[in-house]
Amino acid sequence: MLDFGYYNMDCMAGMKLFPDKYFDVAIVDPPYGINAPNMAMGTNKSRTKNGYPAESTASRLKRSGQAKEWDSKPPTEEYFKELFRVSKNQIIWGGNYFNLPPTKCFVVWDKVQPWDAFSQAEIAWTSYNLPAKLFRYSNTGGANSEKRIHPTQKPIALYEYLVGAFKLSGGGWYLTPM
């Protein structure tokens, strides 16, 4: 078993090192398998930003020399089996894209943004037997804008909300593989 800390390793190999139900909750944002890097960001092709026309995330990453392959396929069934094995509860972003058990407790993140060309909300499947949750938060710019390491990175405020909504503070063990 691994010591507490951060590990840069294949999550499948890492999860296999832990006993059943070791983590109190796993909060994950796996690839949805929708090829997000190659989606054009917006439908107005005459739009420009800093002299560049509207383009896909993949094009921007290639131009910056940071191109990486991700989101071409969803996680395997084995991934979800292992995730459920090592954690007592789960919060899975993009849960609407996966074949998961029925639940009444979804988390809906209302992005509070007006553009029809972008997703106005994101959905997380949870294993909790609680009412559905709604979190309204704009991360499109201004005071709430955060520097991102990854194009699909969720805002810190969203994770702070999850900690409060699911009473996750108090020294439990949390897993965030992917």
Where are these predicted regions, by residue range?
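Class I S-adenosyl-L-methionine
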Residues: 17-28, 32-69, 73-75, 84-178
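SAM-dependent nucleic-acid methyltransferase catalytic core
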Residues: 1-25
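Short acidic active-site motifs
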Residues: 14, 78-79
